[in-house]
Amino acid sequence: MTKGFTQNSSTEATAGNYDASRIAILKDYNETVREVNPEAVVILEHFCDEKEESELAEEGMQLWRNLNNAYCQSAMGYPSNSDFTPLVTFGTTMPYGGWVGFMESHDEERTAFKQIAYGEGPLKSDINVRMKQLAANASFFFTAPGPKMVWQFGEMGYDVSIEEGGRTGRKPLHWEYLDNEARKGLCNTYAKLLKLRREHSELFNPGSTFSWLVKTANWTGGRFLTLAATNGKRLVVVGNFTAKPIEAITSFPVTGVWTNYLDGTKLHVTSIPTGLTIPAHECRVYINF
């Protein structure tokens, strides 16, 4: 809660305003930590003015980036307020890697719980559909460049409310989730996407070209993400968050053979753009390597 590292008084409404003295204090803390351990990772729960967060990031600190509401909305099947674009630093004053994005945290409600409580159609009642939608969420989370945080058991579709036993109450462990095929499938999707980031990190560095169409207006026709590394590696994500199959008009960067990284199936792209039939609540992660 580094927003409180200041001697200036404020209200709830003004606490996040730019504060040069707070920046100076946190820079001093950061420098002291790095004198002891130059490799230390300093992450702040700050949630302040972007100019202030940018200056802190320029000093090598990282700051939480809360996208819980957007990913909860998409998880429940609602296009309103489901814009993912604030997850990334592109088009902002933040240096690359300054934000650590998250879909869930200790302070926010579980996406899977909100599916059960408020989801649209089968997202409320069918665990197989819920896990597919959460896999689509993950595919548009981990393939976006920049650091990410995963809150515990989110990879299994943990659906116990944050209010269970009180907000800070002990929450039940559910390792048996992995005995459920749908939940295990979601966990495998997380693992594969993290492996992709680790083994092909050049796709996710500042030198790569990144674009995505993930705003509210990009709901009914499909959502898209494209990454192009300088070594020729390409990645294209196509997702359908709706309750019906769609014909997603997809602009692959090049023709040729593409592989769905999540299941290994091949796609021969002979023309650009290409129409792809994407079933309801599903996602494809295509690579050309």
Question: Which residue stretches match the model-derived regions?
Answer:
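Aromatic-anchored helix/helix-loop segment that forms the rim or "lid"
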Residues: 113, 118-138
